[in-house]
Swiss-Prot record:
Keyword list, A-Z: Cobalamin biosynthesis, Glycosyltransferase, Transferase
Positions of the catalytic residues: 314
GO molecular function, one term: nicotinate-nucleotide-dimethylbenzimidazole phosphoribosyltransferase activity
Provenance organism: Mycobacterium marinum (strain ATCC BAA-535 / M)
This protein's name: Nicotinate-nucleotide--dimethylbenzimidazole phosphoribosyltransferase
Function summary: Catalyzes the synthesis of alpha-ribazole-5'-phosphate from nicotinate mononucleotide (NAMN) and 5,6-dimethylbenzimidazole (DMB).
Family as reported in the entry's similarity comment: Belongs to the CobT family.
Metabolic or biological pathway: Nucleoside biosynthesis; alpha-ribazole biosynthesis; alpha-ribazole from 5,6-dimethylbenzimidazole: step 1/2
InterPro entries: Nict_dMeBzImd_PRibTrfase, Nict_dMeBzImd_PRibTrfase_bact, Nict_dMeBzImd_PRibTrfase_N, Nict_dMeBzImd_PRibTrfase_sf
CDD domains membership: DMB-PRT_CobT
Length: 358
């Protein structure tokens, strides 16, 4: 049985206190821009003002292969997925380097890599070897879909129970932007050509094959809409279903989460339908160059923290945003107020509301 506990909203009183404190800090009102909004969001998620600095930020990378790669939709062969799982586990991937700088740790989980699991721990939630070719068949069976969503829930629970106070969802899977594009197109009523990007750097011919595969899968998806579970079964994959479960359960557990790029945000779009209101607990770490990513962000009403023209996946874009989130927390919690510092506020009699930039 697939189900999530009702989502409760972040703490509105803590958010209000954070905004009031921002206005009292030794700076012009609003001078820290988006950092002020982010700090208020963290305070609301933690239910306290000032908020605590993150002590255990955790990146979870969900890995899986996709049968649609047989249609030639990617610039890389499918066996790269298994090789990259080993690379991430060994600490040699981009996500490892960026997480180290950002003060986060990394875990990789194998949901549907088309190879034997690298280790018992990595493969503890493995659902199958490779998801089906969504252009011609369902990605998963009913039981596999339920198992993958449950795996995401269990992984989120395990991380929060172990002390994680911020979660980042990442992905690893050759060809996974193809099912991700289908999910976004289906849930935003968008044509394939508007959601399909160049992924890992495909050429025009590969893009055309990818668009055709998305078109065929989207046609198949029409019979299951608007059921989010059936959509994952039909046109998703075990990794995407697990990410959806993970994102939704993070919200159930009242734990803030940073979304990464196209694959993760497509899964989050489904997660919002599995657990309405979950998006209140998420921030979009970055904006990918994949066109479907902006469509998904718009549908979720999320603004990216950074935009660095990244399109790697793995959780890298979200992890780059983590230091920005840390800076937001530090400013709100560590700065002095005007009263504490003995600094004069804006001159009311002169009609000024803010001192000029120095």
């Amino acid at each position: 049985m697939i189900g999530f506990a009702p989502i409760s909203a972040p703490d509105a009183l803590a958010e209000a206190a954070a905004r009031a404190r921002q206005d009292a800090l030794t700076k012009p009102r609003g001078a820290l821009g988006r950092l002020e909004d982010l700090s208020a969001w963290v305070a609301s998620c933690q239910g306290q003002c000032p908020p605590r600095q993150f002590q255990r930020a955790r990146v979870v990378v969900f890995a899986g292969d996709h049968g649609v790669t047989r249609s030639g939709v990617s610039a890389y062969p499918p066996d790269v997925t298994a090789q990259m799982v080993a690379n991430i586990d060994g600490g040699g991937a981009a996500i490892n380097a960026l997480a180290d700088v950002a003060g986060a740790t990394v875990r990789v989980v194998d949901l549907a890599v088309d190879a034997e699991a690298l280790s018992e721990q990595i493969g503890a939630h493995k659902v199958r070897r490779g998801s089906g070719d969504i252009a011609t068949e369902d990605a998963l069976t009913d039981d596999q879909t339920a198992a993958a969503i449950a795996a995401g829930q269990q992984i989120a629970d395990a991380e929060v129970d172990a002390g994680a106070d911020l979660l980042i969802a990442g992905d690893m899977g050759i060809g996974n932007t193809t099912p991700a594009a289908v999910l976004v197109a289906a849930l935003t009523n968008t044509e394939p050509v508007a959601v399909v990007g160049f992924g890992t750097g495909v050429d025009d011919a590969t893009w055309s094959r990818k668009t055709a595969a998305v078109r065929d899968a989207l046609f198949r998806s029409a019979r299951v809409l608007p059921d989010p579970v059936a959509l994952l079964r039909c046109c998703g994959g075990a990794d995407l279903a697990a990410m959806a479960g993970f994102c939704a359960q993070a919200a159930v557990r009242r734990t803030p989460l940073l979304l990464d790029g196209m694959a993760v945000t497509a899964a989050a779009l489904v997660a919002e339908r599995l657990a309405p209101g979950a998006r209140q607990w998420w921030q979009a770490g970055h904006r990918s160059t994949e066109p479907g990513h902006q469509l998904a962000l718009t549908a979720l009403a999320l603004d990216p923290v950074v935009d660095l023209r990244m399109r790697l996946g793995e959780g890298t874009g979200a992890t780059v945003a983590l230091p920005v989130l840390r800076a937001a927390v530090a400013a709100l919690s560590s700065m002095a107020t005007f009263a504490e510092a003995g600094v004069s506020t804006a001159c009311d009699d002169a009609g000024a509301t803010e001192p000029p930039e120095s």
